[in-house]
Each structure stands twice: as C-alpha cells, then as structure tokens.
Design a protein with these regions (language model features):
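ASCE RecA-like P-loop NTPase motor cores
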Residues: 1-593, 600, 649
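Acidic, low-complexity intrinsically disordered tails
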Residues: 1-5, 440, 576, 580-663, ...
Length: 680
C-alpha cells in the first residue's frame, strides 16, 4: 500500500515543528475540530503537508475559489510527487442557471460551457478515491458539496480487464457503452473507444493516455497504454481498471424504473395544479416532463437530467445528494483553507440554490424533485466530516467556537520576516500623501497595493495616478478573471507599479514585490474595514522585508485598534525569536509561474448576464469577506445592522457625503439580498 512521502528541501522551523506536533496529536487523539492560526508567509501549506504525511489520512483540502485551489494543487503536487494529488472544482467555463422571474414572467434557460480539462481532472479525482489507495489528496473548491453520482453505482460500472481473461470483444464493448464511453470511427477523443479487428482502443475520460486491449478470440492477450495521437506504446500491464466516463452512471434497469417513477410524480403534480385552477402551470409541466422522458427513453439522458437525480440515485424526497465527500473513506481528514471565508460559503450555497428552484417548481417548469438536486446544507456537511483542521490568519468565531477556543498558533516565518508595521495618518490630503509614499516606494524598486471602499473610487484613483505618470491598474469584481491574472502578472513583473482595488483579499495575493499597502478611509466601519479584513489586508505586505501599512483615518476605530494591537503582539514575538536565534529577515522569492501556469485550470468566463455590470449592492456580495461576514450573522443581528446602516446612509446623504452614502447603500443592498436568500 502506497504511503504519503513528503519531498522538500526544507525542514520545519520556527513555530512549524510545534504547530505540526500539536495538530498531529489532535488528529491521532480523535479531536474533531482544530484551528491553525498562521500569519501570512508562515508556511501553513507546508505545515499541513507535514501533518498529512505523519497521519497518513486521505485528505480533502477545501478552498473558497478556483484561483487559490489551483495554487494549493500546484504546491501539494510538488510536496507529494509520488502520491495521488487531485483537483476537483466546477468544470463550467461559464454557467447561467435555469431560472424564472415571476414579476416579469421571464424564463431563463440554462446555458453553460464545460471545460474538458477540468472535467478530466474531476473524473481523475473520483477514480483515485475509488482505486483503493489511501495516499490521495484532493484539492477542491466549494463545488465538492454539490451533487454528483452515487459512488456505489459508479463503482459498479468500473471495468476490470486482465491478461488471459475470457471475455468476448462484443461483451467488452457493451460494458464500455454502459460505462458511458461512446464508439467512434472518426476522431479519437477522450471518453470514446474504437475497434480495429481484434484490437480495442479506449481513450480514458480521466487521463491523457488511452488503453489498447488485444484479443485472441474470446481471450484478452495483451493490455497496453498508448499515446492517443501517435499510437506509441507507453506501458504494458497484467491488469487494469477502466473507470466510467461520467460521474452520473445508471444501469438500464434503474433507468426504466426511474422513468416510470417520474411519470407517476408528473401525473400527481399536474393533477394538483389543475385542482388549484392553475391549468397553465399544469400544462407546462406535463409538456416539459413528457419531452424529457422521451429523450431518456431514446438517448438515456435529457437536458437538465440533474433535476431528476433523486430518482437515479434512489434517494427519498429531502434526502441529501451524493457528493465528493461520499467517495472518501470514513477516516478522511478535511483541511479548510482560509476558513474565515470558506466556512460561510458552505452555509450560503443551499439558500440561494433553493430560492431559485422553488420558483421553477411553483410555476410548473420543474417537478418538486428538482429541489433535491442541491448542494449540502451546512449541518449535512458537518455530519459527513470526521475531523477538520481550519487554517486561517484570521479565524472567525465559528472556528474558534468549534475548536473550543484552543488555537494552534504559527506566527514565526521561516524567512524571519516580521508582520509589517502599521501607521495611521489623517484622511485630510490622503491622496497627496499617498502619492508621495508611492513615489518613494517606486524609487526603491518595490510595488504598492491600495485598497478603496468603492469600485468608482478605485477607478478614479487609478486614472488620477496614471495622469501623474504613475503606472497603475485597478481590480474589482467586474474585472474578468483572466484579466485579473494578467494585471497581477504585470504588477509582479514591473509593468505596473500600483494596483488599486476595492478589496484585494479575494485574489489570494502572495506578492513579495509589494512593500507598501495603503488602506484609504480605514475608519469607515463596515464589511471591508472589519478587524479580519484589515488584518488580511495588512498581511499583503508581510512577504517583503521592507513591508509596511498605511491606514488613512481621522479616528482609530475598534477594528483598527484590534488589528494594530494584534500586529504589535506578533511583531514582538517574531523579533524576540529572531534575536534569540540570530536570524536576519530575508526577502521572499516566489516563482511568478505558480499561479499563471495553472491558468487553464482556473479560467472562468462569466455568462452573458453575469458579465454585465452588477446592480448596486450585488457585486459586493461576490467578495468572500463580505459574504463571510453576512453569513456568520443570524437574522436578528442582520436586521439590526440593516437598520443602523440605513440611518447612516440617510445621514451621509443629508450631509452631501455622496461617496459614503453610495458605499452604505451598496452594503445595505448586499445585506437585503443575502437575507432574502436565507431559508426561513
């Protein structure tokens, strides 16, 4: 049995050995929830890699977006080159979900484009988990809590072939079709097979190579893997497993039973609509469902077949869907990266999904079974996980409560770098003061990050700096993913010197070239100026030996005071450690390729609708810090906060402080939208 073996030229240093020891003891001692509080640049990923090696548990690493997931995937593959490191994120290049808007009578049809490379990696992840090996790490986004096929059915459809096995060629071909491979006589693509005499070639759906099976009569004579383009033989095997070409696999008998059950439920729902005098909805449901059933009978699938997944999975109404977690063994370890953002995401997915589907069901576009094609609820997710390690520089109250206040700290950086000092300066003439600091920083050969409160402020400040011949760009939620990647690359390579953003946390930026982080209007309390947000923002300067933070404010808020106090505490501990061990802080040198070489994995093209500028208050919800803050509150607390925010907005408008009023308006709309999506 393969075991995890960590490959690294470095050994744990600073706080890492003690953090690793405590976490390993916790895992082996059966502690369910642990929290690792690690400052930016302290090597949290390296520590978790050591924990994985020492505990030898299959591990799910959960990240809150594709960009950070791809970074983690790259790092874990380097740490564990001899083990199975897999990647599981949403495979949509863009996705417009099906929806119905009753107020305007608008039906929006589902529209999507699937990234074949990511689909291959998803299949590779599930295949690895069912392979019997325990040395498996899967790096996943929140996509892992959404429904996929039943692992039992998936496992039943695995085809095992052995040299000398007696099986007719046609019997193997039938098995391949049942595992959702399709026969081709033309182009040989992933998920297809071709037949040439007594030779069957199968292009595996989850790999870059194909399998060639040679027959001698009804006996398998030889099994090889080949290059699908050249036909060159790569390896020869005595036996091999061929995993299904799709996560949703259903046998013929099950399909016929499902069709009958769907028909019965359709009749009941149509009768209910008619009894309520809603004949239009009843007619609509009957026509749409009948069309889907005809497609299933003819082709074995239909558009939107996921809305019938409850039948195919043999689940009861209301029963949770199968997801990636079902493919793991019971003793797997969950590592939640940036937990202060990721955990609230888990809780937020169900409410938004359900509110959209309820409208479809109520107006006859879908059967009630569509409601069971959903992400996990937070309590379902929690119930499926045996042991969790939360990893964050700023753990939220949820993690601290679950860990019963016991936190493993990792404050010392292997490079000896200290937390950046924070200086508070007045808001008056803040832009002029900032420009002077920018020029000094550029002369030193470093880069600058500036965070503002609104998109408009970011764009206007960026244009103003450009007029002063300061090379600059801006980032916010309306800038496309690939454009953001290009902008970050330009910053690192010195094409631009200044990057302005509404909130730079969502990029997961590790930028050693940045020595100055400026926080404009730091005293404007809210989502983007909370203690956790300010701490995370300050951390962007923690990878540079000359890193520093400027907060422009006319008063020191509670959030600012907490951030400054905690930063000072950490600096004292770091300085004492460096002095005791004779360490001189060293500049971090990070490859510029780490993120960008993964660009084919993280490409996200917004749908035509999503690409339009968001209505006021919607874009702010895309920020994980905002989403995390909102979802961590209960309804009563949110309602109080909404009342207070509305009063502040009205006061700002009366005082003609329109920029502040606009910011508060956006926050209010964000809260109203979030609360509307919560389940009652």
């Amino acid at each position: 049995m393969s075991a995890f073996k960590l490959h690294s030229e470095f050994q744990p240093t600073g706080d890492q050995p003690e953090a690793i020891r405590q976490l390993v003891e916790g895992v082996e001692g059966g502690i369910r929830h642990q929290t690792l509080l690690g400052v930016t640049g302290s090597g949290k990923t390296f520590s978790m890699a050591n924990v994985i090696e020492r505990t030898q548990r299959p591990t799910l690493v959960l990240s809150h977006n594709k960009t950070l997931a791809s970074q983690l995937y790259s790092e874990f593959k380097e740490f564990f080159p001899d083990n199975l490191v897999e990647y599981f994120v949403s495979y949509y290049d863009y996705y417009q979900p099906e929806a119905y808007i009753p107020s305007s009578g608008t039906y929006i049809e589902k529209d999507l484009a699937i990234n074949e490379e990511i689909e291959k990696l998803r299949l590779s992840a599930t295949s690895a988990l069912l392979s019997g090996r325990r040395d498996v790490i899967v790096v996943a986004s929140i996509s892992c809590i959404y429904g996929i096929g039943n692992p039992v059915e998936f496992h039943k459809s695995v085809i095992e072939v052995q040299q000398g096995q007696v099986i007719s060629r046609n019997a193997l071909l039938h098995r391949l079709v049942e595992s959702l491979y399709h026969r081709t006589r033309g182009e040989f693509n992933r998920g297809s097979f071709r037949v040439t005499g007594d030779v069957v070639d199968v292009f595996l759906a989850y790999a870059d190579h194909a399998v060639r099976i040679h027959f001698w009569g009804d006996e398998i004579e030889r099994i090889e893997t080949i290059d699908p383009e050249t036909g060159q033989v790569l390896h020869e095997f005595d036996s091999l497993r061929i995993y299904p070409a799709n996560l949703f696999v259903t046998g013929k008998d099950t399909l016929h039973q499902c069709i009958w059950e769907i028909q019965q439920d359709m009749v009941k729902q149509v009768e209910w609509f008619n009894s309520q005098g809603r004949f239009i909805e009843g007619k609509r449901l009957e026509e749409r469902t009948t069309h889907d059933l005809e497609m299933m009978r003819e082709l074995g699938f239909c558009n939107g077949i996921e809305n019938y997944s409850r039948y195919f999975d043999r689940r009861e109404p209301g029963q949770r869907p199968f997801c990636l977690l079902d493919y793991f063994s019971d003793d797997f370890l969950l590592v939640v990266d940036e937990s202060h953002v990721t955990v609230p995401q888990v809780g937020a997915m169900y409410g938004g999904d359900r509110s959209r589907k309820v409208s479809l069901v109520e107006h006859g576009f879908r059967l009630p079974s569509a409601l069971d094609n959903r992400p996990l609820m937070s309590d379902e997710f929690d119930g499926m996980v045996h042991q969790i390690v939360y990893v964050s520089a700023t753990p939220a109250d949820y993690e601290l409560e679950k860990s019963e206040g016991v936190v493993v700290e990792q404050l010392i950086r292997p490079t000896g770098l200290l937390d950046p000092p924070i200086e508070v300066r007045p808001c008056k003439n803040q832009v002029d003061n900032l420009i002077g600091e920018i020029r000094k920083t550029i002369e030193a050969g470093d880069r600058i990050l500036v965070t503002t409160l609104t998109k408009r402020m970011a764009e206007e400040l960026s244009r103003y700096l450009e007029r002063l011949r300061i090379s600059c760009s801006y980032i916010h939620s309306e800038v496309k993913t690939l454009d953001r990647i290009e902008i970050i690359r330009n910053l690192r390579e010195g094409v631009i010197d200044v990057l302005v953003g509404v909130n730079l946390l969502r990029e997961g930026l590790d930028l050693p070239e940045v020595s100055l982080v400026a926080v404009m209007d730091a005293d404007k309390e809210g989502f983007l100026r909370s203690n956790r947000s300010l701490t995370q923002t300050a951390g962007r300067a923690a990878r540079n030996v000359d890193g520093r933070v400027l907060m422009y404010a006319d008063k020191v808020t509670d959030s600012m005071a907490q951030t400054i106090e905690e930063t000072s505490r950490r600096r004292e501990k770091q300085e004492a450690y460096n002095k005791e061990h004779g360490i001189i802080p060293k500049q971090v040198k990070r490859s510029k390729k780490t993120v960008f070489e993964q660009s084919e994995l993280i490409e996200e093209r917004p749908s035509p609708i999503a690409a339009e500028p968001a209505a006021s208050g919607v874009g702010i919800l895309e920020d994980p810090v905002v989403a995390g803050y909102v979802q961590s509150q209960d309804r009563k607390a949110m309602e109080k906060l909404m009342v207070r925010t509305r009063k502040e907005m009205e006061r700002a408008a009366k005082e003609l402080a329109f920029m502040d009023a606009a910011r508060l308006r956006d926050e209010l709309f964000a809260m109203e939208k979030a609360v509307a999506d919560w389940p009652n």
